[in-house]
Amino acid sequence: MVSLRQLEYLVTVVDTGSFTRAAEQLHVTQPALSHQMRALEQGLGGPLLERLPRAVRLTPMGRAMLPHARAALADAERARCAARLASGTTAGELQVATVYSVSLGVLPPALRVWRRDRPDVDVRLIEFRHADELRDAMAAGEADVALGPVPPGWPGPVRTLGVEEFVVVLPADGASEDDATGVVDLATLADCAWVHYAPGNGLAELVDTTCAAAGFRPRAAVRTEQTAAAPILAAAGLGPALVPANVLPARFDGRVLRPSVPVRRTLAAYTRAAPDPLTAAFIETLVAHATV
């Protein structure tokens, strides 16, 4: 029978890259660690690790096992925290997975309220570049709740937070007729070099899709990983940028226009199963206070 201790040993060996370092981190002797790993492999019917002179490498069976081991350990830790919280014996931690742009623009007001009301519960943010990575991490049990674009076909509970609006940022010194209406046709910016997002960033895909719908492929003057950097670079004159409206600071020097065809995405909080009371309370705080 597989035990949580054995799964913890497996994950630690993989993460540290050696039995010696894993034994030190786990505060056990190396023979005891090796014995538990052999017992785990015997129980599963095959080798999980290939022992190399200076490292270890997962076998195909080990690669298949590892994500399930991580998910089981995460579930066990959440169960422990939930039980101890219910008994009032300890503070807890919420693991919140999200994408970079949401942690920047949507989350801060809700986190401020949560911290005020629940100072005993820490929040650990796990941030991803793309919504697909976020969905995969949540499916693997790496967080209590995920916040981001609604994943198609998600099998668990989904709670809609609202619709995120995108705006176009332009340099402050380039006023045009569009400023009077506050609206810009993206097709008029087809010849511009854009402030774009790095490949692999979920917003890069959104910009490409939006511009394609307007009849052109955006040419990048510069690419950035940071959502917060895009409007600053655009305001400095490097080119137009398409950004979530909620990431703009209160005082901002650039020109901000709405696309003539609105660009929006629905954001949601989603979990693998019915949320525990603590996670459910956090989701309610998001619904009430997130900036969407």
Question: What is each PLM-predicted segment?
Answer:
Residues P155-T160, E164, A228-A274:
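Beta-alpha-beta core module
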Residues V11-T29:
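Short helix-boundary/capping micro-motifs
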Residues L7, G43-L44, M65-S87:
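Alpha-helical linker/hinge and terminal dimerization helices associated
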Residues E41-P60:
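A short LG(V/I)-centered, amphipathic sequence patch enriched
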Residues A131-L134, A139-E142, P149, G200-R255:
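Hydrophobic hinge/microswitch elements
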Residues F128-C192, N246-R251:
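Acidic, Gly/Pro-rich loop/turn segments at junctions of secondary structure
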Residues E177-D178, G182-D185, C192-A214, D276-I283:
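Secondary-structure junction motif
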Residues A91-G153:
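Central regulatory/effector-binding core of bacterial HTH transcription factors
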